[in-house]
């Protein structure tokens, strides 16, 4: 009742799997660089400065525990049964080349959310608001004007 509409981008909640041994590998900066680059369509977006920040987070015990908690929660509570009950307008914004939360997840969200619109950003990975901020903002503003 307090929410008029939603904007979701690269969202989790469906199809989460165990992280296995993929995260976090503390102290391995090359691994952190590779994983950071995978977030973007253009790996050059993963600058040395950004990789340093991600590396610091991956080596901060409190941050890692929080991230693992979020990941475990997403694995335990699949939202597939709850999502169709959302009766609000929803703007889905997805990077067309998202490897973290692939396009088929966007399609499933769109199918399950009765009042959703799905917006693709081409040549864009998981962090659409970062990699394509102008187009991302245009989509958000168009949605908010409705």
Residue ranges and their predicted role:
Residues 62, 101-104, 131:
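Residue-level signal for the nucleotide or nucleotide-sugar donor/cofactor binding architecture
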Residues 26-88:
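Conserved alpha/beta-hydrolase catalytic His-Asp/Glu region
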Residues 2-33:
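Flexible "cap/lid" loop of the alpha/beta hydrolase fold
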Residues 35, 71, 109, 136, ...:
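Hydrophobic "lid"/C-terminal helical patch
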Residues 3-4, 87-88, 114-115, 146:
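Active-site acidic short loop of glycosyltransferases
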Residues 88, 102-111:
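Short alpha-helix in the alpha/beta-hydrolase fold that links the catalytic acid
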Residues 116-146:
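Catalytic active-site module of serine/aspartate enzymes centered on a nucleophile-bearing elbow/loop
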Residues 86, 92-94, 98:
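Short beta-strand/loop motif that positions the catalytic acidic residue
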């Amino acid at each position: 009742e307090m929410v008029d509409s939603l904007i979701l981008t690269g969202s989790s909640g469906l199809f989460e799997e165990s992280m296995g041994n993929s995260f976090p590998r503390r102290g391995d900066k090359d691994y952190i660089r590779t994983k950071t680059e995978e977030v973007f369509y253009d790996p050059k977006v993963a600058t040395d400065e950004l990789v340093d920040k991600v590396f610091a987070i991956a080596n901060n015990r409190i941050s890692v525990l929080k991230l693992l908690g979020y990941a475990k929660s997403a694995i335990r509570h699949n939202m597939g049964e709850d999502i169709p009950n959302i009766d609000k307008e929803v703007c889905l914004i997805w990077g067309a080349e998202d490897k973290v939360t692939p396009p088929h997840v966007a399609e499933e969200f769109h199918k399950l959310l009765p009042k959703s619109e799905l917006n693709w950003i081409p040549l864009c990975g998981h962090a659409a608001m970062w990699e394509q901020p102008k187009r991302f903002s245009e989509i958000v503003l168009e949605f908010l004007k409705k």
